[in-house]
Amino acid sequence: MDMFSLGQGNNTTTSLEPFGTGGNDTGLSNVTFSYQVITSLLLGTLIFCAVLGNACVVAAIALERSLQNVANYLIGSLAVTDLMVSVLVLPMAALYQVLNKWTLGQVTCDLFIALDVLCCTSSILHLCAIALDRYWAITDPIDYVNKRTPRRAAALISLTWLIGFLISIPPMLGWRTPEDRSNPNECTISKDHGYTIYSTFGAFYIPLLLMLVLYGRIFRAARFRIRKTVKKVEKKGAGTSFGTSSAPPPKKSLNGQPGSGDCRRSAENRAVGTPCANGAVRQGEDDATLEVIEVHRVGNSKGHLPLPSESGATSYVPACLERKNERTAEAKRKMALARERKTVKTLGIIMGTFILCWLPFFIVALVLPFCESSCHMPELLGAIINWLGYSNSLLNPVIYAYFNKDFQNAFKKIIKCKFCR
């Protein structure tokens, strides 16, 4: 986002001029042909990949019915926004970077800055809308099913564009300094201190704080739900083990594994005198009703395992079943840990990419206007920070769509032209 571009000013101090462009002939002002060729290739590749990636996401949602849901509508709107950044903003930004001076006039400059701020701010706020939708879905899944409507998604999308509009328009209405238009070779946004605070906090710092809070709560809720599921499984396993046995463990078969017949004999030996026939429920001598569970052999025959009666009669679960329950519980625990690690990894990628792309830019954008006379920003570093922010429009479709198996299947269909048939 070229909200606050960085570069060398007309004197030895640093100002917020785009991509290192300034009125003097230091640094990158006298660009070489090789610099222009290399920069054109790099930026052209970035723009092409951003356009292609976001266009594929939009096409996948439009053509694949299984992707047409509220969550993916937000991802599709994000792709449209990033596509607008790639088509409307990045070509002019690349031209400015390659030529190292603004050549399109003041009116085009104002339009360029307004589109830049509007689209990039909306892109960032779309990430907040997606985080908010996911937070509601995981913390209130039952009620939110009915609330998660296309109308709600449209309201969130409209809000992102409204906030972007409120941040991008003020400089065009006069919230700027006289120096902002003093050099026709430069295209800079307002360096007014009030607008700097207003725009940086509205476009980044407040959304960043909101995303950190939301994804933190999403992680806690997901971890709680995963561990709750594991506890239920463990309780179920414990619920089938109604007693412990002092009898020796069942004998092993020739292959070293507990035999099914041994399980049956172990159960029968312990259930002395318990009336039971053919898996049916029958009255005991003490007139208490017994619940019967069947333990099957590998073969066709089957034995019967009585459970405790209300009068306190004691029975036992074969050791082989207890070990099976333990193995099942252990497998569930491992699956839960894997899901928890995957959740941490996914949220880490989402937040890590967003912070890596935009935090350096907005730190400089907030600090430089207040220390213009004493701060120095190398021109090359300023250009890298600028384009690092722009690259977020390339990475968003990768993070939010290409890691999704449903999107992957849709992309394969697009590549194979199955939608054309």
From Swiss-Prot:
GO cellular component assignments: dendrite; plasma membrane
Residue positions of motif NPxxY motif: 396-400
Subcellular location(s) of the protein: Cell membrane; Cell projection, Dendrite
Cystine pairings recorded for this chain: C109-C187
Binding site for serotonin: D116, C120
Entry-listed glycosylation sites: N10, N11, N24, N30
Tissue localization of expression: Most abundantly expressed in midbrain, in dorsal raphe and hippocampus. Detected at lower levels in amygdala and brain cortex.
Stretches the record annotates as Disordered: 237-268
Mode of membrane association: Multi-pass membrane protein
Span(s) of short sequence motif DRY motif: 133-135
GO BP term, example: regulation of serotonin secretion
Primary localisation category: membrane
Gene3D superfamilies given in the database record: Rhodopsin 7-helix transmembrane proteins (1.20.1070.10)
GO function terms (MF aspect): G protein-coupled serotonin receptor activity; Gi/o-coupled serotonin receptor activity; receptor-receptor interaction; serotonin receptor activity
Summary of the knockout phenotype: Mutant mice display decreased exploratory behavior and increased fear-related behavior in anxiogenic environments. Mutant mice display altered monoamine metabolism in specific parts of the brain, especially in dorsal and medial raphe nuclei, thalamus and hypothalamus, leading to altered levels of 5-hydroxytryptamine, dopamine and their metabolites, as well as altered noradrenaline levels.
Keywords: Behavior, Cell membrane, Cell projection, Disulfide bond, G-protein coupled receptor, Glycoprotein, Membrane, Receptor, Transducer, Transmembrane, Transmembrane helix
Residue numbers binding 1D-myo-inositol 4-phosphate: T314, K345, T346, G352, F403, N404, K405
PROSITE patterns, sorted: G_PROTEIN_RECEP_F1_1, G_PROTEIN_RECEP_F1_2
Similarity-based family: Belongs to the G-protein coupled receptor 1 family. 5-hydroxytryptamine receptor subfamily. HTR1A sub-subfamily.
Protein name (Swiss-Prot/TrEMBL): 5-hydroxytryptamine receptor 1A
Upper lineage: Eukaryota, Metazoa, Chordata, Craniata, Vertebrata
Gene name tied to this protein: Htr1a
